[in-house]
């Protein structure tokens, strides 16, 4: 188990222990016939859980949006070649975490958490811009077009959780066009490899 996984594991274990202790206390209240107090404690525990999950989702969405802004407003195509895939993959990773946390479009979707995230989306976007500005201090290719970044979030939560990264980039005004160019070149290169494989009788899995 690496250090990052160990930290996550320990945090989850502590959270599980805390919730278990609270549930035992609530069960004891019910056994003593203090039903109203038990219900109040259970409601409080649920509200705390929703708040915690909302905060966690907000942090992940902010990171996701930060990476999309980088893809849209980086002024150096060579930087896109170096880091474009990294930024895109991390944006996807953050999104998948959020989708899993809220059970996005599943039968037992976490409606309360989703509503909270929607209410805080503007604040989350502002945090993404702050993250971008911090990254800009170490990566000067993010500085030139920083003023093009919209001050108001143009995405809806549904956009962020459902659309492809390239589509989210292209929704932004005055983006450099470097990332769409990069994606097109990658798709063209992949198609050439697939066509070459067909000619040579090679499986595409071998590419």
Where are each of the predicted segments found?
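Surface/interface-facing alpha-helical segments and adjacent flexible terminal/loop regions used
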Residues: 1-59, 69-207
